[in-house]
């Protein structure tokens, strides 16, 4: 097979994918067999999380990737670059100079998949419901600037905000703002199980075994009315226990596409293969990984302990040994490719330095070695997570300042325990809800945040976050965003580690893979089609 490298044109913020590809048609067609997509995302309905696919609760990339295919939002993020554009709406925009009143007009003739008409009242119901339920996942925080939702007739929706929020159009493109049918979703109760009723480009039928979704079939919604053009009639998503099983399925032809999460070894092998029936797409991503601290926990309550960890951890070594060229060290919660990024942690701590860390602990009268347990999820972020934490353990213990053990748990157990504050130190990842610096800061630092963290900085919450949101020009918001990042680097409630790239592997007759995932890790199944094999 002759491979070629295709670089899509970079346009004002476009994160262009690089394609190591075979020849074939560039355009997919409707019809034909279902395109089968593999993922290692696990979807479980449990006592702690009974409603994994309710838009008012779901707040992880896997669940959102299902909702984005099935539940329509007023706005949508374009596949390449730029600001959100109307989707279920015909038009949207701020109607005042202060960015506090936002109005949308729904498309005429909009319907749910079952044929029920969609009105402005349904939009209001959906937003009000998410805010009323206040799910412990923290997803409702994306709508925290909404004061009231007003309707005028069947097609006009007006959002009155409690403070200026230039990022609000982005927030209306996220699943928590998705339009749901009041017939199927109670106002104050989450919808248990895996059923979804929306107006998105697909309907979804779930195959469930032992309270776990193992297979989801997405079928083209004949009532869909929006901006998306579907290149297929049906896509099947299969959940695999691990990357190895998913890779074997692709090799055997049981699946057509492999998405997150592949192992670093798989990515290296497929990228370097000179004769393969598998195509690999590499694209820049906005995913980050970090350590988070329960700042109320005795072991890390003293800021000096957290600062010492920040001073010892060697990001370059960590990335090199685990991910190689698939990731880059990160010295801020905001990725280097996002407007507003500042190398705050490098500016404060510089290169790893055990002597400096020792001095920090000594000045705070901290007895060493400090005993810590680092917790991680064994199945949510891919097979390399364990090795990553083994290296963190090795680095910290080698300093002589820490006595670190590591402990892994499945996401089903890990996430509820983290939300309850059961872990002193734990590792998490973040796929942005939208590509703006605000979404790397507010979800962790604002009130009702996604980590349920006890850390509070009043200047960040009451001054800097609101200040940054007033600026429609995000470059102008830079000073506020930089100040937030500097405070985080000093207090270390969170320690950023690295930012990663994204990869999609596919059979050679599958088209559209270069746009199957956008920069925020949104799966865009409608882009996939079938071309011609070489």
Predicted features by range, described:
Residues 222-269:
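Ligand-site clamp/hinge motif
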Residues 103-105, 139-184:
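Surface-exposed binding/hinge segments that line
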Residues 329-364, 381-387:
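Structural transition elements
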Residues 30, 312-341, 384-393, 415-534:
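Detector for C-terminal structural segments
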Residues 78, 173-228, 234:
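Gly/Pro-rich hinge or "lid" segments in bacterial periplasmic/extracellular proteins
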Residues 38-97, 128, 197:
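N-terminal lobe/hinge region of extracytoplasmic solute-binding protein
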Residues 119-126, 156-160, 201, 232-234, ...:
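Alpha-helical secondary-structure segments
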Residues 213, 362-432:
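Ligand/substrate-recognition segments at binding pockets and active sites
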